[in-house]
Structure formats: C-alpha cells, structure tokens
Regions:
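Acidic/His-enriched low-complexity segments
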Residues: 1-151
Length: 151
C-alpha cells in the first residue's frame, strides 16, 4: 500500500469528493529535448482548449524546472505580470483566448534529481519515470490521469 508520507510522494492523495474537472483540454503535446552534460533543455508545446469559458488562469504542475521563456501563440509572457512560478506549479494569469498554443522553454538537471521521478541520472544513464506524477519534474503540465493527449 502506498504511503502518503513517502519522501518520493509529490502531492497528497485526492479524494473523490475533492476532485475538480480540469478547465482545459490538452489534445496535443510536443516535446523537444536537448541533452547537455549538466542539464537538459526541454521545450514543451501544449495545445490548450478551454472547457470553462469563465476560466482566466491556468495552473500547471511542475517541480525543479528553470523557466527560460514562455509564449502564448508566439507572444512572449513576462514573469510576475503574466505568470508566476511557485515551488510545485506554474500559474499563467488572465488568459483571454479559448484556444491557444502554450510554449514553455525550460531547463532541468537530471544529475541533481534524486527523487527517482521525472528525468534523472542513474549510473551514468539518463532515465525517466513519469508514473505517478513524475512528468511534472520534466515539464510543466496538468499531471493528472484524466488528461489524455496525443504526443
């Protein structure tokens, strides 16, 4: 049985009564990895479609990712004004579009990742472990089982 206090556990358990439908669909995802000696540059493109037209903010899961740049439909976003990165997520503010392409250029450090989740280095080999909730250590995403996307 899983232990919610396990050091590799990223988030608390979600009870059925606490479940909320995600406000966006993510029908397509494109990932590009540039692997260097001490880091990996990850470019993520998410096609997003609002399900709830009243939604203004987008919150994506992500841990230990350095943000280089963020774009919505080729428009560069400004930190603090347009988005805010917190310890375990990224909040993109005041999105007016119902259908858009979100591009995030980020950097991760597999050698420093000791969680055995996401992308990490083990015995000189780059390895990935995305289930459960490990993908959020590779790229910002709605890292939950009800989001199905074409990669």
């Amino acid at each position: 049985m899983d232990n919610p206090k396990n050091q590799n556990s990223i988030s608390r358990y979600v009870k059925l009564e606490d479940y909320k439908v995600f406000d966006y669909e993510i029908p397509e995802i494109f990932l590009d990895f540039v692997i260097k000696k001490n880091f990996v540059n990850v470019t993520t493109k998410l096609k997003l479609v609002k399900k709830n037209k009243n939604t203004r903010n987008l919150i994506l899961d992500g841990t230990d990712i350095l943000i280089k740049k963020i774009f919505i439909d080729d428009s560069l976003l400004e930190e603090e004004e347009d988005y805010k990165q917190q310890k375990n997520n990224l909040k993109i503010k005041n999105i007016k579009k119902d259908n858009f392409l979100l591009k995030i250029e980020g950097r991760i450090k597999p050698k420093e990742n000791t969680s055995l989740l996401g992308m990490y280095e083990s015995n000189g080999m780059i390895t990935t472990q995305c289930e459960a909730e490990g993908f959020r250590r590779i790229s910002f995403h709605a890292d939950r089982p009800d989001i199905l996307s074409k990669y």
